[in-house]
From Swiss-Prot:
Residues 1-35 form the signal peptide. This is Apyrase. One of its GO terms (molecular function) is nucleoside diphosphate phosphatase activity. Salivary gland (at protein level). The gene is APY. InterPro entries: Apyrase, Apyrase_sf. Gene3D superfamilies: Apyrase. It comes from Cimex lectularius. Facilitates hematophagy by inhibiting ADP-dependent platelet aggregation in the host. Cleaves adenosine triphosphate (ATP) and adenosine diphosphate (ADP) to adenosine monophosphate (AMP) and inorganic phosphate in calcium-dependent manner.
Length: 364
């Protein structure tokens, strides 16, 4: 199913008030006139493949990268100072990789955090940003409340694409959780779990769809239900058990998908138990999902921490991963940064960043 939500399509995203509707109309008009942000005129498909956007510095077998993380602060994203405004925290830092030993260190630019703002919301919530990814020369981030895909530039966000839930024929925005580039297209996924009632009854399979976006902003909705079932079956999990995804990447080097589940359980989903069902495993799958293999990650962790995002370290031939692990328990949020290789060997123990819930990381 193919649909383009970039330029002037019928509005499928229903705000909860007139102001929101007017704002969305304005943004769609803006996107129609100014799609230049991704560097394409209509019909162009030439790619900008520079990654990372900031050139790494290598000296004495040590490589330094600029790295960034962005937050999903849920209900706390609403601005306390400006009306009809929602805010996310964007934090950058320097990551150093010592090639000879694979030692990873990171230094955050604490005190220089940027507050990224938007007026767009759904149901009174917005700017709950769940991913950070470079695509076609731009840094993108994804609001899991509105379904908006933003371009992040100069510490400001500009809407690019609106993703509708499930098969694309829904008035609700898609709950984006992860995104990765494959074969020149951007794949955007959700939790990969059936949407159920509190009693465990399945209401829909919308989170088991994936969006494929080309460089012109055209969206194709893909039914990944079978793929997600195969991923969780690698851990002997079947419904009503579940596996919740927020972190996935495609590797051209291995021609495989890699998933770091946020949480998993043999039992039915329970919102309270979810807080302590954090996973600590890498799952790799071939392109057709015919074979999925789990690898346990070594090192110390806690059950309340689960992966919210990860990226391969550039120039490491996709052998080294840096990831975010978040905590959401009893109104407490925290984010930890870690690094490890594909065999599960920890190269940087889980180290706390701060009390924001960062759900997107990339080399910027």
């Amino acid at each position: 199913m193919r649909s383009s939500y970039r330029v002037g399509n019928p509005i499928r995203f229903q705000p909860t008030n007139v102001v929101g509707l007017l704002l969305l109309s304005l943004v769609l008009s803006f996107m129609l006139v100014q799609s230049y942000e991704l560097g394409h005129a209509s019909g162009e498909t030439n790619a900008n493949s520079k990654y990372p956007l900031t050139t790494p510095v290598e000296e004495n077998l040590k490589v330094r990268f600029k790295i960034g993380v962005i937050s999903d602060d849920d209900k706390n994203a609403v601005s306390k100072d400006e009306s009809n405004t929602w805010v996310s925290t964007y934090l950058t830092g320097t990551l150093e990789w010592e090639k000879s030993t694979d030692k990873i260190t990171v230094q955050w630019d604490k005190g220089n955090e940027k507050k990224v703002k938007s007026k767009y919301s759904y149901g009174g919530r917005g700017m709950e940003l769940s991913e950070l990814v470079t695509f076609n020369g731009n840094l993108l981030t994804f609001d899991d409340r509105t379904g908006l895909v933003y371009i992040l530039k100069d510490d400001k966000v500009y809407p690019w694409v609106v993703l509708a839930d499930g098969d694309g024929k829904n008035s609700k925005g898609f709950k984006s959780e992860w995104a990765t580039e494959k074969a020149g297209n951007l794949y955007v996924g959700s939790s990969g779990k059936e949407w159920t009632t509190k009693e465990g009854t399945i209401e829909n399979y919308n989170p088991m769809w994936v969006k494929m976006i080309n460089k012109n902003g055209e969206v194709t909705s893909l039914n990944w239900q079978t793929n997600y079932e195969k991923i969780r079956s690698s851990m002997n999990i079947t419904f009503p058990g579940y596996m919740w995804h927020e972190a996935a990447c495609w590797s051209d080097k291995y021609n495989k998908w890699f998933f770091l589940p946020r949480a998993l359980s043999q039992e039915a989903y329970d919102s309270k138990k979810f807080e302590t069902q954090g996973a600590n495993v890498i799952i790799s799958c071939d392109d057709k999902f015919e074979k999925c293999e789990p690898t346990q990650i070594q090192g110390k962790t806690e059950d309340k921490r689960g992966f919210s995002n990860f990226k391969f370290v550039p120039t490491s031939e996709d052998k080294i991963i840096v990831g975010l692990k978040t905590v959401e328990a009893d109104d407490t949020t925290e984010t930890y940064f870690t690094a490890f290789d594909l065999e599960g060997k920890v190269l940087l123990e889980e180290t706390k960043i701060d009390d924001h819930k960062y759900e997107g990381v990339d080399f910027v």
